């Protein structure tokens, strides 16, 4: 297959929204593309963070534990995401384990420290909304009541040919 458009993304952060720039009170967001073996180190300080696997596989080593995806999805259209929640006062290094790794993550100030959690796709609650050609699948990666200060993360999948408002 010949691609008409090719991604210009090399590696690094390709999307960034800070609470200051957006005029928000809490949430910061970035999306990052990495090549195999690349490392990203981050210190949450007084923030909690949710890392969502968009495509590929990663390994995380931290002062709170270690986690690894081995069967990550190919892209956002091929299954439910792996999600890693890390509390405040966590120092971690994430390493790309696949040829290409695409992740998104949001972080915000946290009032309390919670336990880290690694959520596998098969343990992610999914809910179907709508009907007929307006059906959507909501993947509750970090639903309300999850056991964190402020972060909530939901992935919405609209099947081909359907529409969503």
Model-identified regions with their sequence ranges:
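Intrinsically disordered, low-complexity terminal regions
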Residues: 1-8
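A short glycine-rich, His/Asp/Glu-containing loop-to-beta-strand
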Residues: 8-41, 48, 131-165
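Fe(II)/2-oxoglutarate oxygenase catalytic core
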Residues: 14, 21-26, 40-42, 49, ...
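Beta-strand residues in well-ordered beta-sheet regions across diverse protein folds
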Residues: 43, 53, 61, 95, ...
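Glycine- and acidic-residue-biased ligand/ion/polar-headgroup-sensing regions
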Residues: 45-67, 160-163
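Ligand-binding loop in jelly-roll beta-barrel domains
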Residues: 74-114
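Double-stranded beta-helix
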Residues: 100-140
